[in-house]
Design a protein with these regions (language model features):
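Active-site/acyl-donor-binding loops of N-acyltransferases
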Residues: 108-178
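Acyl-donor binding region in acyl/amide transferases
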Residues: 72-135
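A conserved beta-strand-loop-helix scaffold within acyl/acetyltransferase catalytic domains
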Residues: 1-88
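Alpha-helix boundary/capping detector
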Residues: 44-48, 103, 129, 151-153
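Membrane-targeting and insertion segments and their boundary/processing signals
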Residues: 13, 70-73, 96, 100, ...
């Protein structure tokens, strides 16, 4: 037990704790998130393997959480979130370890840590686990606009939106995009 942290593995019973950490992390990052009902359906309806939730707690409080999806011997850390003020306690390390341990318990031979930009701090973190990069290629048949100039302002704006309003926007955007 590192810094008094404990990892708990489960399914639907951990959904509220997972979503609390996920949504707060998304807000800290200044990004849009998926609505809670998306994860409810994922946890309850995933039929291609296992869908497991892992929650890391400090003194009973959820401070890190992740979703593990398995399919045909492969496991993917599909969503991963920690509360920033607890990061000095190495929450992400315990969370990854617990997700990997669960993938191994389920008989998976491959574990994916999710996407990251080459050279980014997240990518460097993942390289500590002796990972092998698998490049992703994106193709488009139309000219793409570079939103990078708007992104810093949008991030700051999203951080200011109250959580209940952000959840409504997330649900609306999810319906339009997916």
């Amino acid at each position: 037990m590192l810094h008094g942290l404990q990892a708990e593995v489960g399914e639907a019973s951990l959904l509220n704790d997972f979503y609390h950490v996920y949504r707060r992390n998304i807000k800290e990052l200044g990004s849009f998130g998926l609505p809670e009902k998306f994860f409810y359906h994922l946890v309850n309806d995933w039929s291609h393997g296992h869908c497991m939730l892992v929650v890391v707690r400090h003194k009973g409080r959820a401070v890190g959480a992740g979703v593990l999806l398995t399919y045909n011997g492969m496991a993917e850390n599909a969503w991963f979130a920690t509360l920033g003020r607890y990061n000095r306690m190495y929450v992400s390390y315990l969370l990854h370890f617990a997700l990997m341990r669960e993938a191994a318990r389920l008989g998976c031979h491959t574990y994916g840590m999710g996407r990251s930009t080459t050279g980014s701090s997240v990518h460097r973190y993942k390289k500590q686990w002796e990972t092998n990069d698998q490049p992703l290629f994106f193709n488009a048949t139309f000219a793409q606009k570079n939103p990078a100039s708007l992104y810093p302002r949008l991030k700051n704006l999203l951080r200011l939106i109250p959580m209940p309003i952000a959840k409504i926007i997330d649900a609306w955007l999810t319906e339009k995009i997916y």
